[in-house]
Amino acid sequence: MKKIEKTLDEWRSMLDPEQYQVCRLKGTERPFSGKYNSERRDGIYHCICCGLPLFDAQTKFDAGCGWPSFYAPIEDSAMIEIRDTSHGMIRTEVTCARCDAHLGHVFPDGPPPTGLRYCINSVCIDLRPRD
């Protein structure tokens, strides 16, 4: 996969302030505030920064945590996992494999079949209809 690389100024000009803060500066949207937290429509969730398909809506579930949650990415190669020790915690950050956008974190407390919970900020993704 060919990487997309831009300067922070280029990203800032493309994204709204909240998208920039979360996707490029590794921020977090407030729980229960994102537009996709309760979303039930079918489709594919894409990276807001580069359009890479990330999650199938059929893998979305209600974790009750305040952020959209998925039990699997559309492909393992769609994201990169990075050890995150910020805020006094040990977590696994997930970023877009194509543009390095911060998406959220993955936790080992999800449902079958994977047992994983990809906890993703709504501002980082865009739900599109299936082709």
From Swiss-Prot:
Pfam families: SelR
Residues at which Zn(2+) binds: 47, 50, 96, 99
Cofactor binding summary note: Binds 1 zinc ion per subunit. The zinc ion is important for the structural integrity of the protein.
MsrB domain residues: 8-130
InterPro entries tied to this protein: Met_Sox_Rdtase_MsrB, Met_Sox_Rdtase_MsrB_dom, Mss4-like_sf
One Gene Ontology MF term: zinc ion binding
GO BP annotations, alphabetical order: protein repair; response to oxidative stress
SUPFAM superfamilies membership: Mss4-like
EC number: 1.8.4.12
Official protein name in the record: Peptide methionine sulfoxide reductase MsrB
Lineage of producing organism: Bacteria, Pseudomonadati, Pseudomonadota, Gammaproteobacteria, Pseudomonadales
